[in-house]
Amino acid sequence: MKPFHWSSEKNESLSADRGISFETVTVAIGAGGLLDILAHPNQRQYPRQRILVVAVDGYVYLVPFVEEDDYLFLKTIIPSRKATREYLRRGEADAED
């Protein structure tokens, strides 16, 4: 996977507002927390964006990114209850079967 880049101002804002940083997400990805890579659902408005689905401490975050030639530029971090149910709870249900 290509290296990650991001806006330091956005990272500070995310840390203050949401309690999670791009560093935390990249560490989780390195530790095997990358669950999926999705196409952005609004391709008309965001034609070059895709979304990393990342598990961090038992919760799933959606991380939109733009792929450049040499790196992935991370845009923001969105906590997702729906993705947590779909990705983590599904795994628990599969383990019980």
Task: Label each region the model flagged.
Residues 1-97:
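Ribonuclease/tRNase effector modules and their secretory precursors
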